[in-house]
A protein has these predicted regions:
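Extreme N-terminal starter segment of soluble prokaryotic enzymes
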Residues: 1-4
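Short glycine-rich anion-binding loops that position phosphate/pyrophosphate groups of nucleotides
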Residues: 10-12, 76-79, 102-104
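Glycine- and acidic-residue-enriched helix-capping/strand-helix junction motifs
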Residues: 15-29
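Short beta->alpha junction loops
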Residues: 45-55
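Short, glycine-/small-residue-rich phosphate/pyrophosphate-handling segment
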Residues: 48, 97, 106-151
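Short acidic/histidine-rich motifs immediately flanking catalytic phosphotransfer sites
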Residues: 64-71
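Short Gly/Thr/Asp-enriched flexible loops that form oxyanion-binding sites at enzyme active sites
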Residues: 82-91
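A short, charged, Gly/Pro-tolerant segment at domain boundaries
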Residues: 149-167
Length: 170
């Protein structure tokens, strides 16, 4: 049975309360239970973790090395500036998919920047809670190539960007 770590970063513990027009009315508990059910139906064991603290998230990512088959990760606001989390993902061989409930590419300018995605094998955005299931599907396909620097210029824009697919012809 594959081991998957579901990580949710800062403020995601406030789902259902914070900006329901953007994130919906369902809670983090709803998200975690729905994802765990989907993962179990696909032969995976899930551990759920949420923290508002960068160092705790770094430690959790480090702990996946050699013990976990994949990470589904919504870094929240850390997406836009946390090089510590990006480096943590880069320091382990565990493939990770970055997920966002809303389509961050259509929101405020600062939300369009991800320093995390280059260390991930894919980015899923704007698919609501279903995006987490999409992320698991990508991990189960065995994608291990990371998006890398400048991925936005090499891949077709969209809600789901997977390393090695949808490359722009040069």
């Amino acid at each position: 049975m594959k081991k998957i770590l579901l990580i949710n970063g800062p403020n995601l513990n406030m789902l259902g309360i914070r900006e329901p027009g953007v994130y919906g009315n369902d809670t983090l508990s709803d998200l975690e239970s729905g994802f765990a059910e989907y993962a179990q139906a696909h032969g995976c064991e899930v551990e759920c973790f949420q923290s508002n603290h960068e160092g705790d998230l770094v430690d959790k990512i480090h702990a996946t090395h050699g013990t976990c088959d994949g990470i589904v990760y919504n870094p929240g606001a850390h997406t836009h500036y946390s090089y510590a989390l990006r480096d943590a993902l880069g320091s382990v061989s565990t493939p990770c998919v970055e997920v966002h409930i809303s389509d961050v590419s259509t929101r405020e300018a600062f939300r369009r920047i991800s320093v995390i995605a280059p260390a991930c094998v894919a980015q899923v955005k704007g698919r609501g809670f279903a995006g987490y299931n999409d992320a698991l599907d990508i991990l189960l396909e065995g994608v291990t190539e990371r998006l890398g620097e400048g991925f936005e210029e090499r891949y077709m824009p969209g809600q789901v960007i997977v390393a090695g697919r949808d490359l722009i012809d040069e």
